[in-house]
């Protein structure tokens, strides 16, 4: 039995439809990071495409799937508890502090960035920051199917609609997209160092490691390991794990 069935409590452990879990998982991991990161990563040219595609398939989606299934197999526990089980309490406490600090920083970004965008539509920036914080608190305190289970799928649908609209726009406008070999056709160690990150923008931001930091959430992100267990508590059958956890990350990459 999955935790949603064996430990059902009507709050965190609740069986929900697979499509709804997928949409919530997708929105949990596809925030401002993959959007702004990919835009900034475009400075690196075609190599950014490769990192997003191969990073998602072989790293990010595998990471999300494993973190979700590990949590499911261990009663729906969070990341620090999983670390503590296999690496001891000391490592668990270190991971707990580390996770809290990173989640605080991620939370600040996820509050401040929407507030800046919404400020131009209505109200002040501080007004939106307070409103978003109030929403977060209410959504956290209520059972997961009351607010998150009802609103998140709508937000996720909006994000997917935006992505498909952009895809249609590409086919309608047919903008120029640089080919992979346009920057790499004559690269070699001795004569051309552009691919190592020594020209223009990349002079101070070499491909390694800056590209992998700039486009992190869009290809692989350890932050997702804190989100997958939340949905692992709502899955009815283990066979739903791959389309939900692996599939949500692939969708984010797309």
Regions inferred by a protein language model and the residue ranges of each:
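Selective recognition of specific alpha-helical transmembrane segments in multi-pass small-molecule
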Residues: 99, 103-107, 139, 156-172, ...
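Flexible loop linkers connecting adjacent transmembrane helices
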Residues: 1-14, 38-41, 46, 62-91, ...
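Select transmembrane alpha-helical segments in multipass membrane proteins
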Residues: 14-25, 89-102, 200-215, 254
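Membrane-interface "cap" regions at the ends of multi-pass membrane proteins
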Residues: 1-35, 237-240
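Hydrophobic alpha-helical segments and their helix-loop junctions in multi-pass secondary transporters
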Residues: 107-111, 115-130, 139-140, 159-196
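Hydrophobic, small-residue-rich membrane helices and short re-entrant helix-turn-helix hairpins
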Residues: 79, 142-156, 223-254
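Transmembrane helix-bundle signature of multi-pass membrane transporters/permeases
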Residues: 53-60, 215, 245-253
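Helix-loop-helix module between adjacent transmembrane segments
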Residues: 24-29, 58-75, 79-142, 216-220
